[in-house]
Amino acid sequence: GQIGAMEMIVATAVGGTIYALTSGQPLTILGGTGPMLVFTGMLYELCGLLELPFLSSYAWVGLWTAVFTILCAVTGASTLIRFCTRFTDEVFAVLISLIFISEAVGNLIDTVDAPEVDEYGSLLSLVLAIATFWIAVTLRNTRRSRYLRWWMRQFMADFGSVIAIMAATAVAIWLDVHGLPVLAVPDRFDTTSGRPWLVDLWDLPVWAIFGAALPALLCTVLVFLDHNITNRLVNQSEHRLQKGPGYHLDLLVVGLLTAGLSLFALPWLVAATVRSLNHVRALATIEESVLPDGSTEEHIVSVREQRVTGLAIHILIGLSVLGLPWLKTQGAEIPMAVLYGLFLFMGVTSLAGNQFFERLRLWVMDPHHYPRTHYVRQVPMRDIHRFTAIQLAGLVVLWIVKESALALVFPLFIALLVPLRFGLARSFEARQLESLDS
């Protein structure tokens, strides 16, 4: 409860606006991410074990992380990201999607089983989550519909998730089921716990101030990988972007933002994989082509590269703070089940276009219906399955570490995917790796 919804809204609005104005790749959307949440949770537990105040420790870890991140930016360390290939990018992207899905399903189950929620509230929570997911997915697919005008289909596809939240919340308000868990926000512009906005940096002993540099090194690895891998996914050739990337500038901006956010104990922001890819897709012109087997395949023709949408999104997020007190007095609070449905939507839809996920589907697909992709045509199926199995093993290890007491060193295990990929050169031919991992 020390860092809540209000802190996340403020951090996202301020950080996202600054990033949209100053970054080298404004199509990337900043936000809180699953791996960063895991790291913060483990840092909280570590502070409890050492009997240290969490907010002061959080601030110092953030400040040290900012220093290390800025050093990475000014020394050109982002060039090291060239050693990351599609192998690492895809495993990381699927991990983020699974975190969204597992958090949505797990929290929804906890809500349904909560003793303070009666059977009507449990049933309504389940219905609201499913309805939010279904509406968002349905509206997202209207872009390919034959009905309505083009601009209407485009609007519904781009704002489908917002419409889904509003519709499901309206139903919850209309039914007025008491005891339904809702998003906790203050009645006024204030922190969730009522603490001062500015953190007391000197509430720590000297040894802890310098000791915070150790977890900050791990956090820096996470920020570096999380942000740069997402930027690579945004800049991938399939998106046909015309303007060049700005890895060093982007990392510098994130480092400076981390320092500022840490002073107020606001959530650290990095490139949000799911939101960034959805942002690119919303700005893309997409065409469908018919494959020889009769199936269809989508491909991006162009993307409207600009700063306006990212800037507008975060300004509107900031303005939403002004309406929160009024909405709360009117009883128009967002049920948590609606947000779980949104998380499920974000996790499921972000799997689209991920070749690792598409190759996993081949395991349960009739061989006669395999898609005619380049790797299916050029690589023996046995080797495709072997490559996919290695990626799956890496994903499973990352998940186990995330759920274990080793979660604080979780960033190092993500980094180990890079040498793992280079070790595959001994087991696969170069042309096979070119097809599977180019």
Label every PLM stretch briefly.
Residues G1-S438:
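Transmembrane helical cores of multi-pass ion-transport proteins
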